[in-house]
Amino acid sequence: MQWREMGVVMGTRPYGDEHLLLSILTRNRGLRRGLTRLTKKRPLQIGDLIDATWRAKLPTNLGHFTCEVIASAFYSYFRDRIKLMCLSSITHIMSTALPENEPHPTLYDSFQDFAAAAEAEAPWYNHYLKLELLVLSQLGFALDLSKCAVSNSKDNLLFISPKTGRALSEAVGHAYRNKLLPLPKVLRSISCGVETECCSADEFALSLKILGFFLHRHLLQESHTFQESRKILTGLLG
């Protein structure tokens, strides 16, 4: 049993004295794991784009990878702490929440858009927010930010219900505002597929707090590090 595909490194951890357990995201095969030998070459890092060949006797076996790095993530992320923390966050989210062997080509393509913007030193906040929104929607927990859940109005949408993940208008939500989450304009635009200019650092931080709430609630309750790392990230953004 053998296949070959491009993939993005989602994580590595030691496995015995001579191997690493490697997790990669591929476009056509989804999240895949396998063993790869430790070498004297530069170690694989999260975000690396690799040409991966997987081999095993049976498709249900863990299998082994042989890998060639096509594009290193080092220079795109490791000089910018916020960018690096976002890379660490999304790879942790996807390697933890995505089921193995289930293709999510839209997620893969969105990650590549984020990576391209990061490498080009272009505005990348919106690309990252789209990634986290896609994780929620692809796994069945999409936020509905297109209209008010009560009145169906598309105007003055200022709140999100923490229970349903649906938008509420100012008129409907004002009396309950202390129990609701704010709705940043950029999240609504991205969720509805509307092109918009890159958000500010403050709006990015607020959006990360909101998405972090839903990601933890639905997908990452067993993660002991996600909430703390999200607090650090939003704190760096001011």
Swiss-Prot record:
Disulfide bonds: none annotated. The keyword Metal-binding does not apply. InterPro entries: ARFGAP/RecO, DNA_rep/recomb_RecO_N, RecO, RecO_C. GO terms for cellular component: bacterial nucleoid. One of its GO terms (biological process) is DNA recombination. Signal peptide: none annotated. Keywords: DNA damage, DNA recombination, DNA repair. It holds the Pfam family RecO_C. SUPFAM superfamilies: ArfGap/RecO-like zinc finger (SSF57863). Involved in DNA repair and RecF pathway recombination. Belongs to the RecO family. This is DNA repair protein RecO.
